[in-house]
Curated annotation (Swiss-Prot):
NCBIfam families: prmA (TIGR00406)
GO CC terms: cytoplasm
Protein name: Ribosomal protein L11 methyltransferase
Primary location recorded for the protein, binned into one broad class: cytoplasm
Alphabetized CDD domains for the sequence: AdoMet_MTases
Organism field: Streptococcus pyogenes serotype M3 (strain ATCC BAA-595 / MGAS315)
Compartment(s) where it occurs, according to its Swiss-Prot or TrEMBL record: Cytoplasm
Residues binding S-adenosyl-L-methionine, per UniProt: 158, 179, 201, 244
Gene Ontology biological process: methylation
Keyword Nuclease: no
Function in brief: Methylates ribosomal protein L11.
UniProt xrefs under SUPFAM superfamilies: S-adenosyl-L-methionine-dependent methyltransferases (SSF53335)
Superkingdom of this protein's organism: Bacteria
Entry EC number(s): 2.1.1.-
Amino acid sequence: METWQEVTVHVHRDAQEAVSNLLIETGSQGVAIADSADYIGQKDRFGELYPDVEQSDMIAITAYYPSSTNLADVIATINEQLAELASFGLQVGQVTVDSQELAEEDWADNWKKYYEPARITHDLTIVPSWTDYDASAGEKVIKLDPGMAFGTGTHPTTKMSLFALEQILRGGETVIDVGTGSGVLSIASSLLGAKTIYAYDLDDVAVRVAQENIDLNQGTDNIHVAAGDLLKEVSQEADVIVANILADILVLLTDDAYRLVKKEGYLILSGIISEKLDMVLEAAFSAGFFLETHMVQGEWNALVFKKTDDISGVIGG
């Protein structure tokens, strides 16, 4: 029987997606996220509320590595990369890293128990790939394999991106998804009626993961995934460009985004912590965009910009 090694990283909730991505990049075959906020107001199987759950801003992200993995090297890399994330201004909190060994069947059960179907927006529901789910009329279901990490669609930055796409897309659009990760934004764009979607990520692992998630969803042959460094080599114009990545990276793509967004098109930027908000606004305004919508969840911000000559009801430019 094959055994697995389990590494648990305790970090601030704001670092959930970034740390999940990091763990996959270091060789993890899956992650599970334990967050006390998930239990607020919920009932257990007997109908009782969870009154004794201690609420905390810290979460536990558990990663699973094959027994052949050198955990000492992995943990050293994790600590080094966490320090780098903190230097970008991401709140990681007081980090602790634990590890243990477990059997394969324990690994399979452990990470799956944390993930259930989640209604993210009015129309969009994210469902784990192994779950049979009966969608209601008009409900659009995104199948994801959370063992692949790169975000499960429940983080505030992803939720706001999905909400923006739901508000903007009416059918027939071309969408560019920058830093696609799990591919969730591209899949949502397809389900919401976009004609063609181009998904880019600098990380080869993310490109593979995105394609595997896309393949789980019917009718998503209109999504084209490729490796790419932001928008530097892209020439395809788009009606909508969406990017849910760190603010320090967002400011590097605004000029190229303006070049590629069609007139009256939109730029959706998410993943912005409040202290970096002005920096992103300035970059987008300097590129020529006008601000149409500003969304906030906790310390996270998402911005919807428009490329337009009609500046009524918009800000900046």
